[in-house]
Each structure stands twice: as structure tokens, then as C-alpha cells.
């Protein structure tokens, strides 16, 4: 039994590992995905739960915190998925039961297991995202992600709208002649630095500014519009 602290109710709850994992898979991925994806998510959820339990201070009464991004109760899942709930639950239960008590370790300890929706063919190293090396979170090929329909997306803005978005955050920007230069990328393709007019910002800042699905992108300007091409999600 795991003791979890529910952010919404501010109460500590007792959950079996199996019940937590079912609710975690409901919350953390799309239940309509392939069963293998649900199995992977169940392993990730167990790994992260054990990682947090192993690091909690002695004075803490609960094992870890939950919210609706991390776990859905039965009533919350029913509300979110409606008529699809029963079929999804059966599918998730099968995935959770199939992986049993598997979890990921490094040097015999549970790892921190971050995840994302799609990469652009190569995952990112922890150092490129957090600025800190993590021995087991290294960049690796993931070519299968490129087969997904959502692997590439495009957003178009008029020149005026593009300027408006940038100026809302950087009112002193000089954008009379729209231009952009990507200054550097990580090995996985994520933009590290970009120059727009007289501005220099990080790829993550640009992503947040335009609410992009990814910081791996290209920008194309023409007389009519600005097109941002994004690769991957998350």
C-alpha cells in the first residue's frame, strides 16, 4: 500500500500499487494508444513512484504527491472518458498486469523517469534540458517517433501578428525587418539560441512565447506570413 497526498483534496490517501498505476496510466497517456505504449507508461509510473518514495524525508507522512496530471481516480476517469471508460479500463488493467512489478533502475536504485509525447527522431540528454548531467538520461535514436502523424506541425502567423506576440514579451524589440537566425542546436536538434531582429533568446523562451509543442523548430519568413515548423511534442 502506498500513501499519497492528493493536492486537490489536501488529504492523504491509501492506494494499492495496482490501483495507483491504473489511475496513473489514465492520467499520463492516452488510453487509446497501443497496448505497448500503455505498458511502458505503467513501468514509468511505478519507477517514478519508487524513486520518490526512496527520497522522501523521514518526517514526511506520505510517499509522494498526486494531482490530475499524475493520477485519475475512478470517478475522475469516468468523467473524462465517458462511454469509453470501461473499454479503456480493461485495456489499462491488462497493460498494468502484463508488466507486473517491473521498474527501471540505475546502480540498483529506481531512476527518475521523465517522459514526453514525441521526439523528432532523437531524444534529448538531461544536460541539454536541465543543465545538469544525469548518467542514465542520455540522447538516443528514436526513429519510430517520426512515423507518428503528430511528428511535425506547422503554425502560421501574419507578419503583424508575429511582431505583436514578440513585442508583448519584449516591448523594445526592433522588428521592422523580420528575420530570424537559429544560433545553435543541441545534438538532438532542440534550438538552444535564436536571434530575432535585435533580440537573442533561448529556444525554450521562444517555444513558450509562441506556445509551440516543441523547441525543435525552423522559421520561414515570406512577404505574406511567418511559418514555424515544429518537430516532435514535449
Where are these regions (language model features)?
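Conserved, single-site charged/polar hotspot
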Residues: 1-234
